[in-house]
């Protein structure tokens, strides 16, 4: 059995009697250097510090035989090692004794409800994944450099006015809180930030919308416009944890909206134009999502992570591209393709006649001034073919 004991910055004094008893009866305890240093002299077990990288050492543990003990920060099941151990060895072989999490302590200090505060871990993730367009979050830092790195990104993406509080050594005798704005932390960060810190962010300006307008994206005109983007995402029907291939991605707007739709949704964007690839990366960072940006399709398909769903937004008439997309799609996966030219419409109509699926045509109008009145200006019609691979 592997027993995981959560411990806070207050060390042994903050533990329950059950947790203290487990540590005192242990023969071997694994943990980080900082966590092991929190144990007092009543704990006589041999102490093993995790190496870097840690995962190979964790995989080498054996839950058979004598009990193994692990110390972890706060609640080990909240972005902690407890989840990894259960995934590797099964819940029957792992017992978790949680402590109060840093998230709970931070929310208490800020006066925020835990249940409606987003939790983001930057322990291993890149800082741009914590960029948001509104709301509030507790961000778990990787180290002392994380607050400034996140503050710089927020400022670069127009979020410099965000309320930005760094809370250090939560629950311990050296606890400290420093309030400011993202812009202030980006321009003049303190030099003595503790390694053990979390960030409480209230994102400003608050521009949360279900569907971001076209002007929220960097693009050169190659973008699936807002009304069609909504219809396209409905046809793609994202589900949690699925991966999208956005082929002929243009601005990457479909990939970005896909990643925002459900937890765990990821995207790979294929785009031949270098400037557009830069736009995709910028848009992904601006919306706080991760999009794997690659080159021309289908040449860049080979070493990309396999898709659950494919959107073909450009290159429908490119010889062999539609067939390559269908070949890469797993059984049961959806492919959705949009067309605006007569030639690309013909290609989709031919695919529909061969493979079935659903063929739709969308036409929408925008109301615009017409003299002293209002008239309807037609937008380019869009033909859409969707099919499920059998």
Curated annotation (Swiss-Prot):
Keywords: Cobalamin biosynthesis, Methyltransferase, S-adenosyl-L-methionine, Transferase. It comes from the Bacteria. Pathway: Cofactor biosynthesis; adenosylcobalamin biosynthesis; cob(II)yrinate a,c-diamide from precorrin-2 (aerobic route): step 7/10. The keyword Disulfide bond does not apply. GO terms for biological process: cobalamin biosynthetic process; methylation. Transmembrane segments: none annotated. InterPro entries: 4pyrrol_Mease, 4pyrrol_Methylase_sf, 4pyrrole_Mease_sub1, CbiE, Cbl_synth_CobL, Cbl_synth_MTase_CbiT, Cobalamin_biosynth_MTase, SAM-dependent_MTases_sf. Belongs to the precorrin methyltransferase family. This is Precorrin-6Y C(5,15)-methyltransferase [decarboxylating]. It comes from Mycobacterium tuberculosis (strain CDC 1551 / Oshkosh).
């Amino acid at each position: 059995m592997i027993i995981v004991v959560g411990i806070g910055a207050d060390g042994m004094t903050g533990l329950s009697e059950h947790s203290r008893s487990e540590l005192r009866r242990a023969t071997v305890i694994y943990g980080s250097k900082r966590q092991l240093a929190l144990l007092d002299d009543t704990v006589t077990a041999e102490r093993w510090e995790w190496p870097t990288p840690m995962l190979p050492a964790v995989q080498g543990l054996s839950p058979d035989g004598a009990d193994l003990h692990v110390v972890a920060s706060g609640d080990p099941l909240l972005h902690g090692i407890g989840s990894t151990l259960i995934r590797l060895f099964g819940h029957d072989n792992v017992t978790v004794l949680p402590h109060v999490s840093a998230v709970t302590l931070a929310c208490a200090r800020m006066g925020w409800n835990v249940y409606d505060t987003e939790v983001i871990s930057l322990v291993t993730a890149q800082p741009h994944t914590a960029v948001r367009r509104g709301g509030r979050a507790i961000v778990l830092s990787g180290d002392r450099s994380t607050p400034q790195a996140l503050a710089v990104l927020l400022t670069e993406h127009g979020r410099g006015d965000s309320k930005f509080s760094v809370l250090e050594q939560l629950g311990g005798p050296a606890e400290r809180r420093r309030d400011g704005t993202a812009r202030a932390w980006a321009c003049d960060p303190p030099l003595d930030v503790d390694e053990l810190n979390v960030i409480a962010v209230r994102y400003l300006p608050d521009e949360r919308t279900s569907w971001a307008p076209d002007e929220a994206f960097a693009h050169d005109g190659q973008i699936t416009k807002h009304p069609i983007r909504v219809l396209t995402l409905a046809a793609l029907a994202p589900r949690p944890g699925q991966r999208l291939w956005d082929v002929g991605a243009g601005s990457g707007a479909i990939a970005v909206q896909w990643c925002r739709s459900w937890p765990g949704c990821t995207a790979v964007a294929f785009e031949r134009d270098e400037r557009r690839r830069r736009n995709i990366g910028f848009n992904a960072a601006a919306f706080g999502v991760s999009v794997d940006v690659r080159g021309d399709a289908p040449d860049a398909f080979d070493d990309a992570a396999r898709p659950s769903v494919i959107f073909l937004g450009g290159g429908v008439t490119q010889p062999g591209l539609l067939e390559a997309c269908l070949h890469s799609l797993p059984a049961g996966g959806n492919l959705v393709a949009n067309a605006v030219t007569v030639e690309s419409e013909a290609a989709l109509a031919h695919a529909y006649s061969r493979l079935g699926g659903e063929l739709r045509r969308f036409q929408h109008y925008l109301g615009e001034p017409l003299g002293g009145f209002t008239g309807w200006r037609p937008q380019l019609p869009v033909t859409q073919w969707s099919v499920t691979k059998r």
